[in-house]
């Protein structure tokens, strides 16, 4: 049983987050180890394993990047934890330029405003790539979706770096 089946959801990138959450809470209640306190040791162990499976599946499905990676893995394309280098030099150049721009924000005349504008630009880029990966997955364009997910991971890392700069500026 795959993660989507576990939650009674269609195996697709786009999903209803509130339905996922409610299914998660329902499964948590049903398979909570406390419910099996008087059961046999084997049944208690199975309940603990099922609860762990539910938690792992939920963590994967609730995040767009890990959900896309999971869908790709289901199709035999494993990119989770891979060390493959990005093959798109234009994208890599853009990422380097964005990181340089982020480094220069602290020295700007209005760093908070500059960071807000920069964050908006990167968030827009992230949303565009998410929309593209959804289309690619829906159309079974697995290699294209895998490349897009790799790019999304770069952008997500940049978003985390923005948060660190924001913490420094406001901290």
Predicted regions and their residues:
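C-terminal accessory/regulatory regions appended to core domains
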Residues: 1-171
């Amino acid at each position: 049983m795959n993660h989507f089946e576990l939650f009674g959801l269609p195996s697709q990138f786009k999903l209803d987050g509130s339905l996922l959450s409610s299914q998660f809470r329902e499964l948590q209640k049903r398979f909570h180890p406390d419910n099996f306190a008087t059961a046999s040791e084997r049944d208690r162990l199975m309940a603990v394993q099922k609860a762990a499976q539910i938690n792992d599946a939920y963590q994967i499905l609730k995040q767009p990047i890990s959900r896309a990676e999971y869908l790709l893995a289901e199709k035999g394309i494993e990119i989770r934890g891979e060390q493959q280098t990005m093959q798109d030099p234009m994208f890599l150049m853009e990422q380097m330029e964005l990181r340089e721009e982020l480094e220069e924000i602290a020295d700007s005349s209005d760093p908070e405003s500059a960071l807000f504008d920069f964050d908006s630009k990167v968030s827009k880029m992230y949303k565009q790539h998410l929309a593209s990966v959804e289309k690619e997955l829906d159309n079974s364009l697995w290699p294209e979706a895998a490349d897009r997910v790799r790019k999304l991971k770069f952008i997500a890392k940049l978003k985390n770096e923005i948060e660190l700069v924001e913490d420094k500026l406001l901290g």
